[in-house]
Amino acid sequence: MTITAHMTPDTLDATFFALSSDLRRRVLDLLKREPGCNVNRVAEVFASEVGRFAIMKHLAVLELGGLVVSQREGRERRLWFDATPIQLIHERWTTEFSV
């Protein structure tokens, strides 16, 4: 199955945009190490660099790119890294464009 079956050009662009920021990539690293952590934990880890509002904006970009899945539990929002878009991109460039 090709990437076009799973991702539109807009979602592909959103994924690449989400990955274009070093901070967002480090947020993904955190979510990989600590799956299901809450927004407060992410804000705490990066507090010396950016404020909570900026973290919320970065998380929104990651969600639009399909790289973060969130689930509300009461007043908390739990977060997980979803590598599916990266796997689909990898599939495209290793299968569709291979010699």
Locate predicted features.
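Glycine-centered, phosphate/nucleic-acid-interacting loop/turn motifs that mediate DNA/RNA or nucleotide
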Residues: 66
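Short beta-strand "wing" residues that participate in macromolecule-binding interfaces
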Residues: 70
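Short, hydrophobic-biased segments on the C-terminal half of alpha helices
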Residues: 59-60
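Short, intrinsically disordered or compositionally biased N-terminal tails of bacterial proteins
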Residues: 1-12
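N-terminal helix-turn-helix DNA-binding core of bacterial DNA-binding proteins
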Residues: 10-54, 73-87
